[in-house]
Each structure stands twice: as structure tokens, then as C-alpha cells.
Design a protein with these regions (language model features):
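Membrane-proximal intracellular helices of multi-pass ion channels
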Residues: 1-299
Length: 299
């Protein structure tokens, strides 16, 4: 490896270390329902969601109730995503006229995205219309990531609480994760991606003629909004088959750095959440060090 390569690794590692503690502080306060810079703006929205869904944010759930709520939510998400794929031909925002997804592939994709696995056994450009990409796959990039984060959170609560009647409320944790963490970060970074050249439109694909005279179809669509949550939620399902190796998903060095930081930021921050919740930040840094060593060995 060149000296420039080592310098890039050192710079990236330094940035991750610098953002770990602020992210841990922010996420800890979000899940505790305490003040954060975004709380005055988003708290009314949070309360509105609770009222509409009949959620008591002060109610603590046992681990069984929490697990059942998580499974119910995931099954409902699976059914919805499966139906969207099968009915794709009848849905709007499908300028390429993509047909309904075949049964086995729709099942495979639904299970994959609901479980945050995001295995793709298809070519997105020739399989999925914009409506399914936005309302199906992108939505599950959000919610499956949120489910994973809140499950890590309740594991931390299990370590931190010595005597308690519950481990939190799944619906409250999920709402706060989506509203205060995933959505704000996604909106801001998606705008940066658009600025850097990532497409964000509902236009049909463009037919072009190359310099050699060959015909080429250039795929586009609402890429930026899905790309940011793909990496922030450590999801594997990209808008294009090449994922972040595609120039429309990752056009510049700045977007590449941003995507790497998004991929690891929440995981790094959760180590600090652990330290804060057990009232010993050294425990969080110890876990961070172990994760860093394993990551370094794989570089």
C-alpha cells in the first residue's frame, strides 16, 4: 500500500474517533427522551405519531412484549413489500413499465430487506419501478435499520439495568430512532449527494449514442434519497446493480468519504451509548477498540 493510502486510512480513522463521542451523546439523549438540538422541532411530530397510533410513551414493555412487537412489525413490513412488488405493474411512477416481480424473487427480496440483509438477486435497473424503490425498498432500508439499532439498544439496557420491570417500548424506540437519527441525517446528506451529482428525479431512462455510435440506455431515478439510507443503515440493496461502484450512486471522492462515514458512524456511536448507559465510558471505548482492531485486520 502507498503512503497516500495509509494517510487516507489514518484520516478516516481520526474522523471516526472524533465523531464517536458526540454521536453517542446524541443517541443516548434521543432514546432517553431528553433534550437535543432537534427536539424542539421534532417533539410535536413525535407526540402526533403517538396520538395517531395509540402509543403510551411512558409504558415499559417486558422482553417478550418487545420481541412480539418487533416480530409483528417485521411481518407486516414483509407482507407490504411483497404486495408492492407483485402489483408493480399497476403502481404509479413506473416510466419503464416494469412488470410485477415474480413470486419467488419477490419473497426473497422481501425477506432480505425486512431483515436488513438486503441481498439482491435481481438487476434493479430492469426489475424495480420508482414507486417500489421509494415506498418499498427505501422505506425498509429505514425501518429494518431502525429495528437493528433498537435491538442493540435493549441489549445495552439489559446490561445497564439491574432491576427493572421492562426494557423499554419498541414503538417509542423505533419512532425516536427514525425521527431523530435516521431521517434528519438522510435529508441533509441526500442534499449533499444531489449537489455532488447523484440523480434525484422521476424521469424515464435516457437513450444515448456513445462516441463509437452504439446505443446506450442511461438509468436514473430517485437515487440520492435511497443511496443515503442504504449506507447509513448499512443496507446492501442499491438503486443500481453495481451499488456504490456505480458513478450515479457515488460520483466523487467527497461522496465516497461521506458513505464510508455513514456506514460506520452509528455503529461507532453505539459503543459510546453503551459506555454512557452503564455509567462507565471506558467500557464503550474498550468495545470500540476491539471493533477497530478487527476492522484494521480486514483492511
Amino acid at each position: 500500500m502507498t503512503s497516500n493510502g495509509w494517510l487516507q486510512i489514518a484520516l478516516f480513522s481520526a474522523i471516526v474517533i472524533l465523531i464517536t463521542r458526540p454521536l453517542g451523546w446524541y443517541m443516548t439523549r434521543v432514546f432517553a427522551g431528553e433534550w437535543t438540538p432537534l427536539r424542539p422541532l421534532l417533539r410535536p411530530v413525535e407526540r402526533f405519531i403517538y396520538r395517531c397510533c395509540g402509543i403510551d410513551e411512558t409504558e415499559e414493555q417486558s422482553w417478550r412484549t418487545y420481541a412480539v412487537a418487533m416480530l409483528f412489525f417485521s411481518v407486516a413490513g414483509f407482507v407490504t413489500l411483497y404486495a408492492l412488488q407483485r402489483l408493480q405493474w399497476y403502481l404509479p411512477f413506473n416510466p419503464q413499465g416494469q412488470a410485477g416481480v415474480e413470486q419467488v424473487l419477490a419473497f426473497n427480496t422481501s425477506v432480505s430487506f425486512v431483515t436488513n440483509t438486503n441481498w439482491q438477486s435481481y438487476v434493479p435497473e430492469t426489475t424495480m419501478g420508482y414507486f417500489v424503490q421509494m415506498m418499498g425498498l427505501a422505506v425498509h432500508n429505514f425501518v429494518s435499520a431502525a429495528v437493528g439499532i433498537v435491538l442493540a439498544l435493549v441489549l445495552i439496557r439489559g446490561f445497564a439495568r439491574h432491576e427493572a420491570s421492562g426494557i423499554g417500548n419498541f414503538w417509542v424506540d423505533l419512532t425516536r430512532c427514525m425521527l431523530y437519527i435516521l431521517l434528519p441525517a438522510s435529508v441533509v446528506v441526500a442534499l449533499v449527494f444531489v449537489w455532488q451529482g447523484v440523480p434525484q428525479n422521476l424521469s424515464a431512462y435516457v437513450d444515448a449514442t456513445t462516441l463509437e455510435g452504439a446505443k446506450q440506455t442511461i438509468a436514473q431515478g430517485p437515487v440520492a434519497s435511497q443511496e443515503v439510507i442504504k449506507v447509513l443503515g448499512t443496507n446492501g440493496g442499491g438503486f443500481f446493480n453495481a451499488n456504490s461502484a456505480h458513478p450515479y450512486e457515488n460520483p466523487t471522492a467527497l461522496t465516497n468519504l461521506a458513505q464510508m462515514l455513514l456506514l460506520i458512524g452509528i455503529a461507532a456511536g453505539l459503543t459510546n451509548v453503551l459506555g454512557r448507559m452503564v455509567r462507565d465510558e471506558r467500557q464503550g471505548w474498550a468495545l470500540f477498540a476491539v471493533m477497530s482492531i478487527l476492522c484494521s485486520l480486514s483492511v
